[in-house]
Structure formats: C-alpha cells, structure tokens
C-alpha cells in the first residue's frame, strides 16, 4: 500500500517537473492591493526576437525587470500596446489594440531547436483581485499557468482555499500555497487569510 502511494505521488509530480512556466505571487500588505510576481518562461518560437508577456486587464504593472535565466543578464524591455505588438507579427492578429504587453528584447533570435529562458519580475496593483474585506485578506484570481505559488504576507494565516493546493511554510515564516493547474482552462483560485493573533 505504501509503495502504491509513493508511486502515485511520483506520477503526479511528473507534469510539474516537465512543465516550463512557473509563476510566484508574493502578496504585499493587503491595504496596498499589490502583489509581486516572478514569472519564469522559456521562449521557444524559432526566429523570435521578442517575447511578449501580457499585462492582465484591470491590473497596473510597475517595477518591471527582466533577466535571462542562464546568465542573470538584464534584458531590455518596454511596455507596448496590443496594436504595436501585432505590428511585429509575433502576437495573434485578434489581439485587442488596447491590450498591454511587456515586450522583452531577447539576446538574439531563438535558434531552430533552441530556447531562451527568461524571468520577468513585476508588481501588480489590482483592487479587484486582492483586497481586505471585513479584516480578512482575499486574493481571487484565475491562474492559467500550470505551476503557481501564492505566498501570504508575513503575519497572516490561511483560513480558506477554494482550489486544491499544497500548503507549506517558508523559512521566514510566510505561508505558501502551491497550485498545479491540470486543467485545459484557468484554475479559479480564491484565498482567504486572517492576521495571526
């Protein structure tokens, strides 16, 4: 029985190890309605000179920074409209003109069979997704990436999680909730927390 459980756990982790995209959400004090995002992704489209990371509608993005993960080198980027992104030919033609993207300048075009691993740092402010309600922290956000981690601010404890997640504690005492989105659509995440006494 114990061997079966271990085998099942190993099988369940295989997609997570094989998956490439990963997003870390570090919730800042809820009064700020802000959370720091670290997004790891690999550009694999042959010949691509850029990588376009959409800025979610309703969120205000600040403190952007991009590095190449293999070297740690800072990469040039700019925020562009959907119209400007479409003009490059590297985003879908049906992208709305008013959409916003972080346009990352890759070190060189992605070679055939190659890749460029990048890490995007940004801070979102979004009072709809992240707020303080009746003294409780509420984070509600659909997550489309396969692997996601949400870290609560220090001094808060989890009291509700609407989607299956693995709860653990960081070395600094912050609570983290890890999600594996095995769906073909977005995982509806809702986290509620309260201040520790």
Where does each model-flagged region fall?
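Residue-level recognition of well-ordered beta-strand positions that form the cores
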Residues: 38-42, 53, 119-123, 151, ...
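Sec-dependent N-terminal signal peptides
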Residues: 4-14
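Solvent-exposed loop and beta-edge segments used for protein-protein assembly and interaction
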Residues: 29-35, 44-46, 58, 96-98, ...
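A surface-exposed beta-strand-loop module
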Residues: 63-66, 70-137, 171-197
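Early extracytoplasmic/domain-onset interaction patches
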Residues: 19-53
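Hydrophobic/aromatic beta-strand elements that line small-molecule binding cavities or substrate pockets
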Residues: 39, 108, 148
């Amino acid at each position: 029985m114990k061997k079966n459980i271990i085998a099942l756990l190993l099988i369940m982790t295989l997609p997570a190890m094989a998956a490439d995209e990963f997003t870390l959400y570090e919730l800042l004090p809820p009064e700020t309605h802000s959370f720091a995002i670290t997004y790891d992704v690999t550009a694999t489209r042959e010949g691509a000179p850029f990588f376009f990371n959409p800025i979610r509608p309703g969120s205000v993005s600040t403190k952007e920074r991009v590095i190449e993960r293999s070297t740690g080198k800072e990469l040039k980027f700019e925020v562009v409209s959907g119209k400007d992104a479409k003009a490059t030919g590297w985003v879908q033609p049906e992208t709305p003109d008013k959409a916003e993207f972080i346009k990352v300048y890759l070190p060189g075009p992605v070679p055939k069979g190659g890749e460029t691993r990048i890490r995007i740092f940004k801070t979102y402010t979004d009072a709809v997704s992240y707020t303080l309600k009746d003294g409780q922290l509420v984070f509600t956000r659909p997550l489309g990436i396969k692997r996601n981690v949400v870290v609560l601010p220090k001094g808060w404890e989890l009291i509700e999680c609407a989607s299956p997640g693995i709860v653990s504690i960081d070395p600094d005492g912050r609570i983290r909730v890890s999600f594996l989105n095995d769906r073909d659509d977005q995982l509806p995440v809702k986290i509620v927390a309260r201040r520790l006494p």
